[in-house]
């Protein structure tokens, strides 16, 4: 979606943005993309096709291209363009400049210190940053409230994920509160171990628990938009998706820094854990 993200700059002609990475990385780039769309007449955005459904193409001039098809599809369009890329490679930067790029902005990918990653992106561009960026729903504030607690217990890797017992306890506590409450456990393609934990768990009120395995980002988004009371998960892409749909989102940070990686969104709650408390 197109929002006011900073003080207006002089309107420029063309920008080309390259963005790969995981789902969370992509969603954290949406504020920057909105700023670029507000600053350029033409924007070409190369990313994974699986992310296309998260970008509002109706507002402003934006062309979405498949990142995996490479530079060859835009060779003749680089001249005079400002380039925004997350690949910090000298040869890559030189190639873009040789093709006539105006400016090449190398944006941060994995900072371990400093400001929030979104703010760090704006700093790299020497662009004023508005704190309200943190509380916007960058995919759309589409929360529909019902009695379904959505839990995504995996997708963060062993060093990020909370123990499955933590989420089992959350689910059972929620189910005890009201007979109308129910729980959806959601699993990604790499969550085999945690899915096994789920199948082996001896839940109370198991009739009010279901599991889903979305096969695409778009399917996951559509499932969440059908209604939930709140989302619980680890520092991973699904949490960023829920938060930027306006859903009340609880993210458990175990080994990464919430000051750098917390999701943007209007209803985000952060829960910090250290190894001694788990």
Model features per residue range: what roles?
Residues 1-278:
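Catalytic machinery of carbohydrate-active enzymes
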């Amino acid at each position: 979606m197109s929002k006011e993200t900073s003080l207006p700059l002089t309107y420029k002609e063309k920008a080309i943005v390259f963005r790969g990475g995981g789902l969370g990385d992509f969603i954290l780039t949406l504020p920057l993309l909105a700023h670029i769309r507000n600053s350029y007449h033409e924007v070409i955005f190369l990313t994974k096709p699986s992310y296309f459904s998260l970008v509002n193409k109706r507002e402003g001039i934006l062309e979405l291209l498949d990142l995996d098809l490479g530079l060859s599809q835009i060779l003749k369009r680089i001249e005079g363009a400002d380039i925004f890329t997350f690949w910090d490679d000298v040869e890559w930067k030189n190639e873009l400049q040789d093709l006539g790029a105006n400016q090449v902005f190398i944006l941060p990918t994995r900072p371990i210190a400093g400001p929030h990653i979104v703010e760090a992106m704006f700093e790299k561009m020497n662009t004023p940053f508005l704190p309200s960026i943190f509380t916007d729903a960058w995919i759309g504030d589409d929360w529909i409230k019902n009695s379904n607690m959505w839990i995504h217990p995996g997708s963060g890797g062993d060093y990020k994920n909370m123990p499955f017992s933590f989420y089992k306890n959350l689910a059972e506590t929620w189910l005890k509160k009201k007979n109308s409450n129910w729980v959806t456990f959601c699993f990604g393609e790499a969550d085999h171990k945690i899915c096994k934990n789920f199948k082996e768990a001896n839940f109370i009120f198991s009739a009010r628990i279901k599991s889903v395995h979305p096969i695409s980002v778009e399917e996951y988004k559509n499932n969440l938009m059908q209604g939930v009371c709140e989302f619980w998960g680890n520092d991973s892409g699904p949490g960023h998706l829920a938060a930027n749909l306006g859903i009340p989102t609880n993210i458990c940070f175990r080994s990464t820094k919430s000051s750098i990686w917390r999701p943007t969104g209007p209803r985000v709650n952060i829960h910090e854990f250290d190894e001694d408390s788990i």
